[in-house]
Amino acid sequence: EVLTGGYYEVGVHIPEGIYTVEAQDGESAIYLIDDENGIYIWQQIGNDPENPNQAAVMDDLRLYDGALLEVKSGAALQFRSDCAQTERLHGETNPLQDSVRVEVGQTMTAGRDFPEGLYNVKSEPDWNDLMMTLPDSFLSEFAADEERRVEVISFAPKELELSYENVPIPKGTEIQTTGAAVTLEPSEKIGSTDYGEFYKE
């Protein structure tokens, strides 16, 4: 299985299993969050011999159902497993069908201008940041009065850095783009429909 930049829920977008991961070309990184099993991993993956923090191949990556895997943009990563539980995939077809285009200078709000949901974000070929300002309910109790929580996804004019898969956009989130228009395309498969759960502390 080949994954590019984006978020992947184990059991929905990739089967549970023990994987070997290798960059096909370029450099990337993975971030694994598995609260149930207490597994938290950040690992750079690529073929730069001068980067001591980077692994050419990562072995024995254990992905358990319900864990969240983030693949950073920059390279396509090959995930190989001899024990992937493909028969246990339980994602549902995304009920959303319509794509949403956001132009530079435009602000669009999930739940008002387009439905909340799980989207693949595609950028026009330019340097670009997608700014997602979350509702105040996602602020921590220690946040300053005027503070807003902003999540940023960056794009670059390279083939593997112009999209980010399976981005949760909960109701009330304001979407802006800084350098080029983006298109929000509904992801093929979804797990939980609590799209805000991803951003809860």
Task: Identify the function of each model-found stretch.
Residues 1, 25-103, 123-201:
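Primarily secretory-pathway and cell-envelope proteins
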Residues 4-6, 10-18, 106, 113-118:
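A glycine-anchored, Pro-Gly-centered beta-turn/N-cap motif
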Residues 9-10, 59, 109-110, 165:
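Short, flexible, glycine/charge-rich loop motifs used to bind or transfer phosphoryl groups or to couple energy/partner
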Residues 110-112, 116-129:
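A charged, solvent-exposed segment within the mature domains of Sec-exported extracytoplasmic proteins
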